[in-house]
Amino acid sequence: MPIAASEWSLSDEASFEDEMPKLWGDWGCSSEIGRLRAVLLRRPGPEIEALPEDLSSVLFVERIDPVRARAQHDAMAELYRENGVQVHYIEQMQEHEPNGMFVRDLVAMTPEGAIVARPGTLVRRGEARYAAEALARLGVPIVHTVCGSGTFEGADLMWANRDLALVGISRRTNAEGNRQVRAELERMGVGEIVTIQVPWSEAHFDGLMTILDRKLAMVYSSQAPYTAVEALRRHGFKILEVTSEREVRYGMALNVVALEPGRVIMPLGENTETAKMMEDAGVEVLRVDLRELNKGAGSIHCMTAFLKRDEL
């Protein structure tokens, strides 16, 4: 017997974001510093054991020791757990994809769910499939997969807060990928979305700047894009300027992850001046040794996809 239209259960005015905790799970991110609740990682598997002779062909700078690399990755994951962060994993990666551990590039989180990347380098192009499989297994909604001629990597999206998002154009994220990401953020009602032209020398802009606290950012002064710094200042951020190329390049001084406002994890290495600058500004700095993993040209921020942060 047909059901009368008057008896249909019609949609209410609730937004997807409002319904997500009940129907999908407690996911979402709209800042770099809100209390971190859940992350997605890839513990390096067989893919790091048979690196080619030409390391540059897989974007690595040095050959890594698999046993030491996994031990350091496990220590990073345990530090997250000790600080109340749920750690989830990508369970599979093809054996020719050693960069799969740099999960930040594969997933960009939004208040409504994940944007799945399309890496800009051919050697990384297949990794996103396994990130998408992990998201589906966890119940994280995928709001968009970058497609067509677009390329985009998650490290080219930085949330200052819900009212300001920075989206790069770089060697890894092209104009079409930037457009697709901007369109999703505009649909979600983000107050201001600023396109950042990333210097040619950089893969992404997350190695040039980071958010440390509600109104505190740190930048590598000689390379930080003007439009990014200007946007942050316009929104009331104080800017700390790092000048040491050695600390930024080799110590990965800006490759940090905030656990909450004013409290960050920083890779151990040649970055003591930058760490002191953070501490002098009132930021608590935790250290973790990732020097073996850093030989793959990335560190903790590159290896961490945020799945859930508290709203500021």
Predicted regions and their residues:
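The feature marks the mature, well-folded catalytic cores of soluble enzymes
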Residues: 1-312
